[in-house]
Each structure stands twice: as structure tokens, then as C-alpha cells.
A protein has these predicted regions:
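Structural recognition of the beta-strand scaffold that forms the well-ordered cores
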Residues: 3-7, 14, 70-71, 86-88, ...
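Solvent-exposed loop/turn segments at secondary-structure junctions
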Residues: 9-14, 76-79, 93-94, 133-138, ...
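Active-site His/acidic residue clusters
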Residues: 21, 141-145, 179-227
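Membrane-interface soluble catalytic domains
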Residues: 103-104, 111-112, 122, 136-139, ...
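Glycine-rich, phosphate-binding/catalytic loops in enzymes
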Residues: 20-26, 55-56, 210-213, 237, ...
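Active-site-proximal alpha/beta segments of enzymes that process anionic O-linked groups
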Residues: 15-28, 36-188, 295-301, 313-321
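Short acidic, glycine/proline-rich loop/turn micro-motifs
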Residues: 19, 99-100, 205-209, 282-284
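Metal-dependent active-site segment of extracytoplasmic phospho-/sulfohydrolases and closely related
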Residues: 3-8, 13, 59, 217-264, ...
């Protein structure tokens, strides 16, 4: 099974797929408490907003109709850096050290992303990542979350693409990323791919989740998702390739815009799953609710990646220096 993970930044599930969210009790409230340091002044707030008068995400709805929508709950701080670091590496904020969008003090070098874990499981694997937010893929930025793996880049085995066309803000960058990603997916069919789009988050910050602009942004990225799914659907139709398509988000938005704290509307995420080529793999069919750090392990298990282990009697990864005391003159240790 090949994997396409699509990350839609800042999407409110209760507005994109209101009927499905309302029908699942696991979407109503977080399954674990938030960090009190990031408590919202007004408390957790309302659980749901006012659904749009007409559907805004037909592609997501079609994917869900042929697959399933799983609740995912983010752990505050509900910002993009901590959110994507957790979603893409399968680690908590404490483990990866990402607490802010500045990535100060991160430990991402020891927290490999989903694509790198696929490669580690089988070094023949071809991987691809494209992102509107450079911090996820660009080594010159504060991250990146996705490991660079330059040796694999040289031979085209690992490809990274960051959107640079900001002439129309994230909207133009999203179009650029989608165009590149759809071409690679359709013509090269990597074994695992991640595509990030940020237009909805930009709209949420500009006008808030209660605005017409926010709903229009959801519709725009939904159309981008359709292009990406079409790219791999053609490979399934012509080549018989089996594809697992997954869609997720890193946080929601308040009605007035913004996120970062522990309101229900910003902590709620989702994992939309759809398989081209058969029923969902058993590990995914049994899911009821996830936390952000459980998304990558669930997807890896579904495509056949098993966690590696190192069995040793020493503490791995710890740097310890010898004391500057000189030799003991014990002949057993003189060489």
C-alpha cells in the first residue's frame, strides 16, 4: 500500500464536515486534558460552530463516504509547529521539543518524520514532501520537521518542495505546491508522500472561522485535495497501485480567528482515511479516537512499517565525557 498524507492547516472539522462530526460523540470533547499553561481565558468554549448553509468540502465528504473520519485531539499549545511536529513524527511536545512556531530547542533530529521512518524500514522506498509552510521541509528555516536526507535527494529518491509563490499569499503558494505534488504523484508514484496546504489557516487569521472567507478557503483547499486524489486515482486505475489517502489538520480556529490555547474548537482535529484498491487496513478500521502523536504510528502500521528497536544495556543517545582526572595507573586499563 502506498501512502498519501495531506495536511490542511487550520481546518475546522465541524465546518468542513459538520454532519459527520456531529454524528460521532468522540468529536464532542477532548479525550485528554490540556496543559494548564495554555488554558484559554474564557475556558474550553463551545464545542461546535454554526454549520455552513451549503457544503464547502465535497471532496472531503466523498473521501469520507468511501472511507471513515476518525477524531484526533491535539495537545496544547495548538500552534502549527507543535501540531505538525507531533502529527508527522509520532512524538509528544516533550519528546520532540517543539513548543512554538520558532522551533527553539527542538529535538527533531532524533524524532524522524513519517517519510523517514518508511525509508528506514526499507531503504529502497521513494518519498516526497511538498509544503506551503517552508518550516516543514526547508532546512534554511526554523525546522524542518521532515528530515532532509541529502544522500537520497541526490538520486531523486527523496524529493522536497517548498512553495515560494506568495504573490497572492498562501493561496498562490498552495496552487504552486498542488501543481508540483500532483505531477510527482501522478507520474512518479512515490511510496510515501506528504503534502501541506496553508490557505485555510491564513484565512482564519485574516477574518476568523465565522467568516465567509474562511469557508471559501476550505472550498479552495478541498479542490486542491481533489487534484491530489485524482493524481493517485489514475495510477490505481491504470497501474493497479494500491493507495491509502489520509487527510488531517493541525488545529482549528476561533470564530474571531486565532488558536494556540485549549478551546475545543481549536484542539479538534481529524484523520480522514480512504483507500483506493480495497477496504481500509485492519489497524485503521478499528480506530475510535486518536491523539496527535498516535497518527503517524497508525499510518505506518497500516502500510506495513514496524518500529525498529535496539536492544542494548546502555542508555542510548546520551553524551557522557570522561572526568579530567588523568590515568589511574591501574595496569588493567593501561594499553
Amino acid at each position: 500500500v502506498k501512502l498519501l498524507l495531506i495536511g490542511l492547516d487550520g481546518v475546522r472539522a465541524d465546518l468542513a464536515l459538520p454532519e459527520l462530526v456531529a454524528a460521532d460523540p468522540a468529536f464532542a470533547a477532548p479525550d485528554h486534558p490540556g496543559d494548564p499553561r495554555f488554558s484559554a481565558p474564557g475556558g474550553p468554549g463551545a464545542a461546535f460552530g454554526t454549520p455552513p448553509a451549503t457544503p464547502v468540502a465535497p471532496t472531503l465528504a466523498r473521501l469520507a463516504a468511501g472511507g471513515r473520519l476518525v477524531p484526533v485531539w491535539m495537545t496544547p499549545p495548538t500552534d502549527s509547529g507543535p501540531g505538525w511536529a507531533s502529527l508527522l513524527t509520532g512524538t509528544t511536545h516533550e519528546q520532540n521539543g517543539v513548543w512554538w512556531n520558532e522551533f527553539v530547542g527542538h529535538r527533531l533530529a532524533r524524532c524522524p518524520d513519517l517519510l523517514s521512518q518508511v525509508f528506514a524500514a526499507d531503504p529502497r522506498a521513494r518519498t516526497f514532501a511538498a509544503s506551503t509552510w517552508p518550516a516543514l521541509v526547508d532546512a534554511s528555516g526554523p525546522g524542518p520537521v521532515v528530515h532532509q536526507r541529502p544522500d537520497q535527494q541526490v538520486g531523486g529518491q527523496h524529493q522536497l518542495f517548498a512553495g515560494t509563490d506568495v504573490s497572492d499569499g498562501c493561496r498562490s503558494a498552495d496552487r504552486q505546491v498542488t501543481t508540483r505534488a500532483a505531477w510527482v504523484l501522478n507520474h512518479e508514484g512515490p511510496d510515501a508522500a506528504f503534502v501541506h496546504l496553508e490557505g485555510v489557516d491564513e484565512a482564519g487569521h485574516r477574518a476568523g472561522a465565522a467568516s465567509a472567507g474562511y469557508l471559501a478557503a476550505i472550498s479552495a483547499v478541498d479542490e486542491h485535495v481533489r487534484h491530489l486524489v485524482k493524481a493517485v486515482a489514475e495510477r490505481f486505475e491504470q497501474l493497479g497501485e494500491d493507495w491509502l489517502v489520509a487527510v488531517t489538520t493541525d488545529h482549528g480556529h476561533r470564530a474571531e480567528g486565532g488558536h494556540g490555547e485549549d478551546e475545543v474548537l481549536v484542539r479538534r482535529s481529524f484523520l480522514l482515511l480512504h483507500r483506493l484498491g480495497g477496504p481500509l487496513p485492519a489497524p485503521l478500521a478499528a480506530l475510535t479516537s486518536l491523539r496527535s502523536e498516535q497518527v503517524t504510528p497508525a499510518l505506518l502500521a497500516a502500510v506495513g512499517v514496524r518500529p525498529a528497536s535496539l536492544e542494548t544495556d546502555h542508555e542510548v543517545g546520551v553524551v557522557r565525557d570522561v572526568a579530567p582526572v588523568g590515568p589511574t595507573r591501574d595496569l588493567r586499563y593501561e594499553w
